[in-house]
Amino acid sequence: MAPSFDTLTEQDLHEEEEEEIDFSDLKEQYEVKLEEGLDTFVVIDGLPVVPEESRQKLIKFLLRKLNTVGHTSEDAVFMPLNDKNMSEGFAFVEYETPEQAIAAVKQLHGVPLDKKHTLAVNKLMDIDRYGREGRIDEEYKPPTIEPFKEKEHLRSWLGDANARDQFALYRGDKVGVFWNNKSNPPENVVDRAHWTQLFVQWSPKGTYLASVHPQGVQLWGGPAFSKQKQFPHPFVQLVEFSPGESYLTTWSARPIQVEEGHPVLTYEEDGKNIIIWDIVTGKPLRSFVSHDLTAGPGGDGEPKKKVQWPAFKWSADEKYVARMQQHQSISIYELPRMNLLGKTSVKIDGVMDFEWSPATVVREGVKQYEQLLCFWTPEIGSNPARVALMSVPSKEIVRTRNLFNVSDVKLHWQSQGTYVCVKVDRHSKSKKSMATNLEIFRVREKGVPVEVVDSLKDTVINFAWEPNGGRFVAITTGEAPSGAAVLPKTSVSFFAPEKKGVSAGNFKVVRTIEKKTSNAIYWSPKGRFVVVATVHSQTNFDIDFWDMDFEGEKPEGEKDLAANLQLMKTVEHYGVTDIDWDPTGRYVVSSASVWTHSMENGYNIHTFAGQTLAEHPTDKFKQFIWRPRPPTLLSKEEQKQVRKNLREYSKEFDEEDKYAVDIANTAVVETRKRVLNEWAAWIRREKEMLAEEKDAYGVPEDVDSSKQAKDAPAVSEDQGETVVEEIVEEIIEENEEVIG
């Protein structure tokens, strides 16, 4: 019978009281914390010793400094006097909040009050905590020095005898790092379950592998991928490295809540979304609140917000980092102090986007150091849209260009900073049709001339410069009907400069391939080869491999251009979502991630020319990323010498490849020999057992078979002349014909 109130005993009532629901976690979360303690007090030391009649005057003078970091008053400053009615050289100050007290310690400690006196500011709680009797041992004891432990070599993978590359593979709940073995199965380096909660990311030079967790970010490295650094940022969602791996930016949609006594984070980070970290020390340099971008009206008419990422963009040499407040300004900070350059942001009305040059540029006629930054503003009232180049640290505008009838602008720097292409989407006066112009700034030339490429009649949906080169590819499309299930037809245009002596000539179309569905461009990191693909499609999966410097016959109409275009191969990869070149430009991986769809997930490895080496269907495949390599240490002369002797090196590499194949074939032959020996031994044993049974039952012995069993020779591994023949049948063609 089910228990009821009437059937409850006295013992049951007491048990109910004992088993009362525990609300302690909810109480802790929602409890109103009363202010208590001495967190709002600071102690100011290093003050002048003055008589009682001058004390008030000194307090008023001191308040000028104190109120620069918070709010306090004369009543909140206590300056004690001794028996001689003279001040003691220190004072107690109460601020309105603990955060103001922390700011006073950070910003006023060590600040001169006048020529003879320098302020020493400490929290009263710290003095109580560390200065209490018994906390400090008055007798000196030398510190314990830990025995030296040699650190792991963080770039050990570069010493691989076969110059192989590594990649990280995230599938299911496991993350592994593997060696690429071309067509052979990859060799595992490390494989761990639950290594990350969101994704993994390599640092730009491949030194660290970052894993993302609710508690923060961890960096791993060395031959065994041991833990190198930790960056506690609760509920972190995005990470970004600086180009030289010195700094790390982390972002979370949730404002940080710093608990008292946190070993790394302080009240300065409380309520912030973004932290910039020093990777070497593992400490935060500065924290910020997010600035969201507007992304057009939402369904309810309200403007949608999208995350501005990367929130901070780095100069090529890591000396500066900048962020944009859309429509208002660009703030440039100096590293490593993270102070605002010139103490003010650059006010730019309407600013929509900006990009640093990816390399330090030396402009013609300019001798002083500079980093270049490009930004654009839309049309405001009667003022045209504008693209400008700014020199940093001077903040001088070195080139501007006005634009009209602008719908959108995208900025594309060439990897060496030689060019910046401004992709301008223009609307007609009736605003019913769209077209794209390319405005190319020749940054290194005197006066920064601008070349306009207006041969494209449709809208450019993708654009990519050749790394370390002067060619580019653009994909265009007409206006697709909204809600169309079929991909719109696209055209792929290959551009190259004309041959004109030392300097590059104007950009001309090498060739345009029409009636495609391609929507993505992936250049080899070494240039020359480019993959043009259709990704994130449900119907088309073409991957085209192009060579821009084909060594065959050049068409007559393209002889004046610095290119010889050739389609090497087209392959298909069902459901392809991502394409990744390895850092040497030898291999390409196409992959289908479960993050996009759950059909036939996995990855395929191809050569640069499109030959498929291996297919790896992988259940719950999520992410494939090659490990980057640091820049080469060879000088330009040494690199030139290597290219000159490349044919000789190629012979050595071919011999090594042949030797590796021979070893693999030898292993197969040895395995087959072993299996054959085992089979022959089994036959011999069976025949001997059969002969013994016949003898036991009095069955006449077959002399020939017994003799054959005893005389059956073993296949020795030392017999070099043993030939193992394997017959493989393959159907070349099959025809079915109906007769009658």
From Swiss-Prot:
PROSITE patterns: RRM. WD repeats lie at residues 193-230, 232-289, 302-343, 513-556, 571-609. InterPro entries: EIF3B, eIF3B_RRM, Nucleotide-bd_a/b_plait_sf, RBD_domain_sf, RRM_dom, TIF_beta_prop-like, WD40/YVTN_repeat-like_dom_sf. Keywords: Cytoplasm, Initiation factor, Protein biosynthesis, Repeat, RNA-binding, WD repeat. Signal peptide: none annotated. It is found in: Cytoplasm. Component of the eukaryotic translation initiation factor 3 (eIF-3) complex. Residues 1-10 have a biased composition (Polar residues). It comes from Aspergillus niger (strain ATCC MYA-4892 / CBS 513.88 / FGSC A1513). RNA-binding component of the eukaryotic translation initiation factor 3 (eIF-3) complex, which is involved in protein synthesis of a specialized repertoire of mRNAs and, together with other initiation factors, stimulates binding of mRNA and methionyl-tRNAi to the 40S ribosome. The eIF-3 complex specifically targets and initiates translation of a subset of mRNAs involved in cell proliferation. Coiled coil: none annotated. Pfam families: eIF2A (PF08662), RRM_1 (PF00076). Residues 1-22, 695-721 are annotated as: Disordered. Gene3D superfamilies: 3.30.70.330, YVTN repeat-like/Quinoprotein amine dehydrogenase. One of its GO terms (cellular component) is cytoplasmic stress granule. Belongs to the eIF-3 subunit B family. GO terms for biological process: formation of cytoplasmic translation initiation complex. CDD domains: RRM_eIF3B (cd12278). GO terms for molecular function: identical protein binding; RNA binding; translation initiation factor activity; translation initiation factor binding. Residues 13-22 have a biased composition (Acidic residues). SUPFAM superfamilies: RNA-binding domain, RBD, Tricorn protease domain 2. This is Eukaryotic translation initiation factor 3 subunit B. Residues 40-126 form the RRM domain. Its main location: cytoplasm. The gene is prt1.
